[in-house]
Amino acid sequence: MAPRKRTQNAKSKKNPKAPKLEAFLLDFDDEVHTIVERLKEKTNNLLKDADNLYKTALIKLPMAVRKMNWIEYCNLEKPKSPVDDSKVREEAAQVELAIAGNHTIPKVAAKEAKSSANSEDENMAPLKSTMKKKKASKKAPSTSKKPRTLSISKQGGTIQRTTRKPLITPARSFLDSSIIGATPLITPRFDPRLPKTPALRSALHREKVYSMSVNGSPLSAGGEDIVISVPIGNGECIQLLASEMDSVDLSQLDEKALRSIRNLQNRLTTLCGSSK
């Protein structure tokens, strides 16, 4: 005989969506529970804030009014001897100073400020997103590419001439390199009779001086011989060596040079006399 077929019960079949549904319901219950707890906490905070505001308003009232019950306060008529307004103001000012000393800020005002700031941020966010979308739509690049030759042809067919001067090179001899003229082949000799420049100055006392001859070679003062510079005018001066002083002919010097030598002689005599 052939084996008997197994009969499957519909109740024994497992639905694959059942565990997902159970997990979704558990998550939904947890989320609802957390939302309910937050709402309860907010209600408790609002009740505490209302109680604190009620107490602060009650403290500002005068003592005579605080001792009354609600029935007396509601049926209150103007008394024959009214409370002095100045005393009421003084008590209210003292209470306000005491409250300010504690630096207590009601939570309702802070929460209202936060909620208003959040609402403003939420209102500004969609505006910014729409502005960005508009800008992006305006700056959308065009897919059509134009050849380079067309862009060049649109700039204009006329050729603009540049106003720059051509470069001056040694090969281009027809142009002068300066206003004065071409550079001479031989450098001219230095003329001491040229006008003095603003930077020209006389040597200071005990200052190191490096002189130069008329031929253009520098003169070093490395020897042991004493050198005396005598000015003769027109920016020129003569160097006299102490070793060859006997061979100097003073008649060849002008009056200014002789006057300078006599002045130097007098100064040296006074210097040597004071040293003794």
From Swiss-Prot:
Chain segments annotated as coiled-coil in the UniProt record: none
Principal cellular location given in the protein's record: nucleus
Subcellular location field: Nucleus; Chromosome, Centromere; Cytoplasm, Cytoskeleton, Spindle
One GO cellular component term noted in the UniProt record for this chain: chromosome passenger complex
Keyword Cell cycle set for record: yes
Stretch list, region Disordered: 111-158
Alphabetized UniProt keyword annotations: Cell cycle, Cell division, Centromere, Chromosome, Cytoplasm, Cytoskeleton, Mitosis, Nucleus
Record GO biological process: cell division; heart development; mitotic sister chromatid segregation
Disulphide bridges: none
Domain of life: Eukaryota
Physiological role: Component of the chromosomal passenger complex (CPC), a complex that acts as a key regulator of mitosis. The CPC complex has essential functions at the centromere in ensuring correct chromosome alignment and segregation and is required for chromatin-induced microtubule stabilization and spindle assembly.
SUBUNIT field: Component of the CPC complex.
Protein family per UniProt: Belongs to the borealin family.
Designated name of the protein: Borealin
Gene name of the record: cdca8
